[in-house]
Amino acid sequence: MAGHSKWANIKHKKARSDEKRGKEFTKIAKEITIAVRSGGSGDPEANSKLKLAIQKAKAINMPNENINRAVKKGTGEIDSETIEEIIYEGYAPGGIAVMLEIATDNRNRTASEIRHLFSKNNGNLGESGCVAWMFKRVGLISIKKDKLNMEEEEFMLKVLDAGAEDVREEDEEYEVLTLPESFMLVKEAMEEEKLLIEEADIVMLPENTVDITDVDMAGKIIKLIELLEDHDDVQNVYTNMSIPDEIIAAL
């Protein structure tokens, strides 16, 4: 868990340039279109995957026009290319496991470009299944400790009663873990309790993390991760690394 939290902190500190915002819009638009097609409905109240994607779009101030266009691409009201979802697996420098969630209209092009990014940055794209066993798909909902509007014990009981699998305590936040299928139920129960959710998504969490205690190695890994995140077809990047605060501070 610590690996997820610390990496999330790094991402949040990165500058949000106009170019990056544009990339975020493109990726969320793909997620919305895919959610409509896979869920069989353009109605977010009848399609929990779409509901989550739209919530994520609004969280980054994506215009309603963009959201509606992405939904219509999913329903077929607007012509669009076929988008394929793929999982790629590989290794970053230091043997760190990497999982990539891909959304592409050209599998061969994407595979070639991702392989190139790995090989140029001291990593390698692996075979299917090479690192997937190190990760588990879960719902993850985080809430800052200083935003908690009730006693800790009451909070724990409420989220567990709502269907959460576990609640873990980090330095500055609580992380609520759910099964993917109960994620939206738990999230909505927390919202009804007026809990201010910091982050919420279905993610791939590592079963165990690897501490990176060398500054140069941490820099190499982060460089590759950021290049992968910036690729147009990469929706999400997950790793099993954990970088101590003092190493982050030295970067």
UniProtKB/Swiss-Prot annotation:
A single MF term (Gene Ontology): DNA binding
Cell compartments where the protein resides: Cytoplasm
Annotated GO CC locations: cytosol
Transcription regulation listed as a keyword: yes
Keywords annotated in UniProt: Cytoplasm, DNA-binding, Transcription, Transcription regulation
Signal peptide: none
A biological-process GO annotation: regulation of DNA-templated transcription
UniProt-listed Pfam families: TACO1_YebC_N, Transcrip_reg
Primary location: cytoplasm
Positions of the UniProt region annotated as Disordered: 1-23
Top-level taxonomic group: Bacteria
Record has Transcription regulation as a keyword: yes
InterPro entries from the UniProt entry: Integrase-like_N, TACO1_YebC-like_2nd/3rd_dom, TACO1_YebC_N, Transcrip_reg_TACO1-like, Transcrip_reg_TACO1-like_dom3, YebC-like
Protein family: Belongs to the TACO1 family.
Protein name in the entry: Probable transcriptional regulatory protein Swol_1435
Organism expressing this protein natively: Syntrophomonas wolfei subsp. wolfei (strain DSM 2245B / Goettingen)
